[in-house]
A protein has these predicted regions:
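Acidic/His-rich structured neighborhood in mature extracellular/periplasmic domains
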Residues: 30, 34-120
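Mature N-terminal segment immediately following signal peptide/propeptide cleavage
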Residues: 1-28, 34
Length: 120
């Protein structure tokens, strides 16, 4: 769990004040359950990986890596790459690309003792 907390704190350290404000929601927020994955964004919350710096995007990806087995992480990244390929194939990278994913935090600062979570 410490690896996940540390990776998330490193991602937060990369964010500016506006991004930090945009990414944080209360632990009981209804946004926790408002997840979707169509070609277009239904719920605009958090930060979009295709709109942030490469270093912040890499830091968020490290959060995923910390939460998954190596095989699971490789599968997730492969699915993201396929999404990018499909966007190129149909010439619609604005609505389908490798990094068209949002990252959102719920709860206070990431901790090993207090409730929190994230959505990707």
């Amino acid at each position: 769990m410490e690896d996940i907390v540390d990776a998330t704190k490193r991602a937060l350290a990369q964010m500016d004040v506006t991004q930090r404000r945009r990414v944080h929601y209360h632990i009981d927020s209804s946004e926790w359950r408002s997840w979707s994955n169509p070609e277009f964004l239904l719920y605009d919350k958090g930060i979009r990986l295709d709109e942030v710096s490469g270093s912040l995007r890499d830091a968020v990806m490290e959060v995923l890596r910390a939460c998954m087995s190596p095989e699971g992480y490789d599968k997730a990244v492969a699915a993201m790459r396929i999404n990018g390929f499909l966007g190129e194939l149909v010439q619609a990278p604005a609505i389908m690309n490798e990094y068209l994913y949002n990252f959102v935090l719920f709860g206070d600062e990431p901790s090993t003792t207090r409730p929190w979570g994230f959505s990707f």
